[in-house]
Amino acid sequence: MLLTSCGTGPNDPDASETAGASAAPSGTAASGPDSSATASATGPSPTAEDAPLDGLVIAVDPGHNGGNSGDPAAINAEVPDGRGGTKACNTVGTQTDDGYPEHRFNWETAQALQEALEEAGAEVVLSRNSDDGVGPCVDERGGFADDADALVSLHANGTEDRSAHGFHVVAAPAGEHADEETAEASEQLASALVDALEDEDFAPNPAYDSPVVRSDLSTLNHASVPAVLLEAGEMRNADDAALLESSDGQERIADAIVDALVEVLDP
């Protein structure tokens, strides 16, 4: 199987897209606070402190997909890159040295994030509804969030150097789909996420700015709302891999994302 590194080096802004999928989207999955209405009706009404994201819609994009490797024609199809050009629909993603795939990390962390967001009062929409499909493509992963209040795209990096470690967060500059105000909000959200992850004892990757601003990631380029892409760690680094594979690590990442969203979006 050909594996493509999810991320790129800090000095390689024109490398392949990290966020990804397929030319044949499997649709989006929506989930929100209505699913728990029966249970909550028997207890006290949530306060603003209990549900700081009440009334907001958060789009979550678990990068790649488990079926991408089985459909190279789909994931290699050219799609708009959001900057006037085209690029491949997606890549397969990376994996740890013991074979834990990035797409599974992204999916499992998305599940933890969905739960944490709903506990904070948000409605959650997902760019894919399983981890065994193909797609959607990177342009659709950004565009599906048009009716949301923010987009978080989940990834993990695949630098070949096993000594590379730590997370980095990416925002995009203003462009075809996001004006200057939205781009500024994206960078603000990215900065808040850096701080929140550090508060959860995650170490930033010293090779990258905190946050990174890049114009070559099509998922971010197609977002019309504040959007960030998280590379949560280096999957080929043994310590990072152990953390990313653990439910504790995934839940702490989810908690940090919620904290960042609350800081920036708390209505």
What are these regions (language model features)?
Residues C6-V57:
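N-terminal low-complexity, Pro/Thr-rich disordered segments
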Residues G7, Y100-P267:
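Active-site-proximal helix/loop segments of hydrolytic enzymes
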Residues S16, T28, S36, E49, ...:
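A generic alpha-helix propensity feature with a strong bias for hydrophobic helices
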Residues S16-T18, T38, N65, T94, ...:
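A generic signature of intrinsically disordered, low-complexity regions enriched in glycine/proline
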